[in-house]
Each structure stands twice: as structure tokens, then as C-alpha cells.
Amino acid sequence: MRIALLAGDGIGPEITAEAVKILKAVVGQEIEFDEALIGGAAWKVTGSPLPEETLKLCKNSDAILFGSVGDPECDHLERALRPEQAILGLRKELDLFANLRPARLFPELQAESPLKENIVTGTDLMIVRELTGDVYFGTPRGQRKDDQNRREGFDTMRYNEDEVKRIARIGFETARSRSGNLCSIDKSNVLETSQLWRTVVLEIAQEYPDVELSHMYVDNAAMQLVRAPDQFDVIVTGNLFGDILSDLASACVGSIGLLPSASLNSEGKGLYEPIHGSAPDIAGLGKANPLATILSGAMMLRYSLKREADADRIEKAVSTALEKGARTADLGGKMTTSEMGNAVLAALN
């Protein structure tokens, strides 16, 4: 198993180092990591946030473990050269159209949630977000002057039926592997794009008679996520709505330092990363929480490498470490990044 290791910027090298430590402890010599530059670190050396060498490595690897991108020293660059463009480029080049973001409340961390205990207890959901279409990629887009010489910005929200079909199937398959309940979230009372979305999802539902499908408007879904998050198991939605709702769900369960993600293509190749950013303000200080990256490694084992038992083992070790009181600063503790990794390592054994 060959893994492309893209540590990136900010806290990326620190948190990926802990994930690699755990993965090697679980899998041993069967897994090998090939490092490459990406983001601001790559731009400083090559002049590109996504060098051809890095892209080639990713295409030839079994999976990608990604740290973070984002560097204030690159804020002056034009959009195409900014570190954040690297992740967009990888999604496009590898056709990583399906983003899976679990949001699970660890019982040991109920006090970290901003929601009341009786509301948030039992929250364990998965958001399946379409990642390569919608308003983020639709054209035309830009800025111009209107007929009265006023500045205006414009974007295009667009989906075709094939894009909706393939993400819907991922949603149904994910629901089938869990509780059998899927909620499709759209804005079909207003948007033509969402009307197509709902129509196609209903068509695909005929292929999954064992999965119970419901629909919800995105504004109501946002309210329901903070009112009664335990009503959801699997959510499938578009790029824009998924971007917003997944961040909201992450806040419901506590620190974003706990939440992993997977971005998959139709062949099962995936990019695995924590949902948080590069946090340049604490880079190199040993304050970052590595658990989201460690859990991203577990998702990599499950979805791309088909090692379910190993993934379960890592997730159980994280839970055990938290149960024994392991806490980094974001969780109200004093552990360093490496100490948290060592706590998970000890729990493995």
C-alpha cells in the first residue's frame, strides 16, 4: 500500500506525523508513505501550489493523506497561485466528487458541545457532500459592470443529472451500510437546480427499496441540526449546502480538531484530511490536536484500503484515549500534539 503524504502548510506536518505514527503501528510494513510538497510550501519551492510531480504521485498512489494548506505569506498572490487552489486542483484532476464527513459526539466530550446534553447526546451522523459541481464550479462567473455602470458579481449554480445520480448512489450506499435512513437536502421550493436534484434522487431511490428516504429544505436542515441532531443518520446534499451544513455539524459535536473527512472518486481512490485549516498561528508550537488527522487515517483504511478491522481499532483507540482524559488545548487540556498521538498509541496497545 503506497500512500501519498501531503503535509502542506501550518500545522500540517505536525498532525500528519502523528497519523503516520498510528498507521504504521497498526498496519506495519505493509504501508509506505511517499512525501510531496503542496500548498504554500510547494509554491515557495516550485512556484505552483500543486506541482506536476505532486499530482503524478497522487495519481500513482493507493490513497492520499493530506494535512492542510493555507499560508498568510501567500495572501498577496493571485487566486490561481494561492495554496487553497491545490486542494481544488486535486479534486478536479482525480475526480474526487464525493465528500464524506462524519460528525460523531464522543461521550467523553459532551461538555465541549455548545448544545445542551439532552439535545446532543447520541449524535452520530454522516454528511455526503457532492464536491466537484454546483456554484463553486459553475460557469459563467466573474465580476463586471452592469448597464448602469454598477459593479456586480455573478456565479452559476448548475448540476446535470449524471452528477446527481452518482452522489445520490453514494448517499444510498452509505445509508445502507448504517441505519438505512437517508435525508436528501435541497432548496427545491426556490431553485431549479434543486428541483432537478430532488427528481433525480427520487429516481435513484427506486434502486434502494431498503433505504428510507426523506427530504428537507436546507434552511430547515440547519435549524434541525442544532435543534435535534440525533434525528439524522446520513445526509446527502450539494456542494454549497454541504459545505455549510458540515461545518455546522462539526460545531455541534465540539472541537473541529476531532473531525475527519474523505473525498472519493468512482474507483475508490480517496484523499483523507482533517476538516480544520492550517492554523498558522499555532504552527510549530505543538498545540494542534492530531485526532482529526488520525481519524482521517482510519477512514483511509476503511474506504480506500478495505481494512475495516484496522479502522475500527484506531477509532476505538481514540475513544479510549479520550476516556482516559487525553486532552489538547482545544479540548481544555495541556497535552502537546505528540503527547496526544502517544496517548492514542498507548491505547492501541
Swiss-Prot record:
NAD(+) binds at G277, S278, A279, P280, D281, I282, A283, G284, L285, G286, K287, A288, N289. Pfam families: Iso_dh. InterPro entries: IsoCit/isopropylmalate_DH_CS, IsoPropMal-DH-like_dom, Isopropylmalate_DH. It catalyses: (2R,3S)-3-isopropylmalate + NAD(+) = 4-methyl-2-oxopentanoate + CO2 + NADH. The record marks Y136, K187 as: Important for catalysis. Mg(2+) binds at D219, D243, D247. It comes from the Bacteria. One of its GO terms (molecular function) is NAD binding. PROSITE patterns: IDH_IMDH. Its EC number is 1.1.1.85. Signal peptide: none annotated. Keywords: Amino-acid biosynthesis, Branched-chain amino acid biosynthesis, Cytoplasm, Leucine biosynthesis, Magnesium, Manganese, Metal-binding, NAD, Oxidoreductase. Pathway: Amino-acid biosynthesis; L-leucine biosynthesis; L-leucine from 3-methyl-2-oxobutanoate: step 3/4. Its cofactor is Mg(2+); Mn(2+). Binds 1 Mg(2+) or Mn(2+) ion per subunit. It is found in: Cytoplasm. PANTHER family: 3-ISOPROPYLMALATE DEHYDROGENASE. Belongs to the isocitrate and isopropylmalate dehydrogenases family. LeuB type 1 subfamily. Homodimer. Catalyzes the oxidation of 3-carboxy-2-hydroxy-4-methylpentanoate (3-isopropylmalate) to 3-carboxy-4-methyl-2-oxopentanoate. The product decarboxylates to 4-methyl-2 oxopentanoate. This is 3-isopropylmalate dehydrogenase. The lineage of its organism: Bacteria, Pseudomonadati, Pseudomonadota, Alphaproteobacteria, Sphingomonadales.
